[in-house]
Structures are given as structure tokens and as C-alpha cells.
């Protein structure tokens, strides 16, 4: 069975891993998943990530907890294969009044909504993280 939406699968694995208090979760790797993991690490939502470059590359994301509670309270896919969501620089959303981030795919690469607003770029809204 082929996977229709690998990004949704990644977000679901992270969500389920934190619900089960796992230390880390593994998933098939891709350039976009690695870029999302790098952004989550830079924003402080995960501890670390690593790519095992074997026959089938695998991405391992080390999850982050604070006082035994998951740091990621909510992670939600926005733009999906059946309904792509694009926003220009003026209509980029703020997540939880600025406490969360929106992952935006721009012409300059993947970045948070704050960084995209600062750079004056719009793009595809991949997901919300809070």
C-alpha cells in the first residue's frame, strides 16, 4: 500500500509518539521531512533528529518533554494533497496568538511564519505547531 500523504504520516507519528511518552519516533526519510524536523529543532519543539542513510533512509526524531508533558501540544496538517493552502505575506496566520508557529514552504525554503513575514514572503502553509 502506498502512502498518499507522507507529511501527514510524519506529523501523526510525532503526535502518537508524544501521546505514548516515547523517547523517539522513526519514519521513512525525505528532504521535506528533514527540513521540517530541522525547523522544529530550531524552534525548540524537538530535542534532535538524525537520518540513517542505509538502503532505505530513515529519519529518527527525538521528542521533547517539559515536566513530563509533551512540548508539542498541537500539531496539525493544513495544506494537504486534496486541498493546497497558499497565503501571501500579508495574510500569513499567527498560531495561538504568536505562541505557536506555522510551517511555511516559500521560494527560499521552509521557514516559520515569523521568518516568512520578516522576509516578506508568502507560500504554502504546511502545518501548525503549538
Curated annotation (Swiss-Prot):
Function: One of the primary rRNA binding proteins, it binds directly to 16S rRNA central domain where it helps coordinate assembly of the platform of the 30S subunit.
Gene3D superfamilies: 3.30.1370.30, 3.30.1490.10
Subunit structure: Part of the 30S ribosomal subunit. Contacts proteins S5 and S12.
Gene Ontology MF term list: rRNA binding; structural constituent of ribosome
NCBIfam families hit by this protein: PRK00136.1
Entry's family note: Belongs to the universal ribosomal protein uS8 family.
Species name: Vibrio atlanticus (strain LGP32)
Gene Ontology biological process terms, A to Z: translation
Residues that span the membrane, as ranges: none
GO CC aspect terms: ribonucleoprotein complex; ribosome
Calcium is among the record's keywords: no
Keyword Ribonucleoprotein: yes
Protein's name according to its UniProt entry: Small ribosomal subunit protein uS8
Highest taxon, organism lineage: Bacteria
Name of the encoding gene: rpsH
Keywords recorded for this protein, A-Z: Ribonucleoprotein, Ribosomal protein, RNA-binding, rRNA-binding
Source organism phylogeny: Bacteria, Pseudomonadati, Pseudomonadota, Gammaproteobacteria, Vibrionales
Amino acid at each position: 500500500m502506498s502512502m498518499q500523504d507522507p507529511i501527514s504520516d510524519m506529523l501523526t507519528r510525532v503526535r502518537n509518539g508524544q501521546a505514548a511518552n516515547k523517547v523517539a519516533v522513526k519514519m521513512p526519510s525525505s528532504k521535506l521531512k528533514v527540513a521540517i524536523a530541522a525547523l522544529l529543532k530550531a524552534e525548540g519543539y524537538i530535542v534532535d533528529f538524525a537520518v540513517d542513510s542505509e538502503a532505505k533512509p530513515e529519519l529518527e526524531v527525538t521528542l521533547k518533554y517539559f515536566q513530563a508533558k509533551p512540548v508539542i501540544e498541537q500539531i496539525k496538517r493544513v495544506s494537504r494533497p486534496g486541498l493546497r493552502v497558499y497565503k501571501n505575506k500579508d495574510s500569513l496566520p499567527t498560531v495561538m496568538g504568536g505562541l505557536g508557529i506555522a510551517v511555511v514552504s516559500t521560494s527560499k525554503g521552509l521557514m516559520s511564519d515569523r521568518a516568512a513575514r520578516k522576509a516578506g514572503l508568502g507560500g504554502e502553509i504546511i502545518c501548525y505547531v503549538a
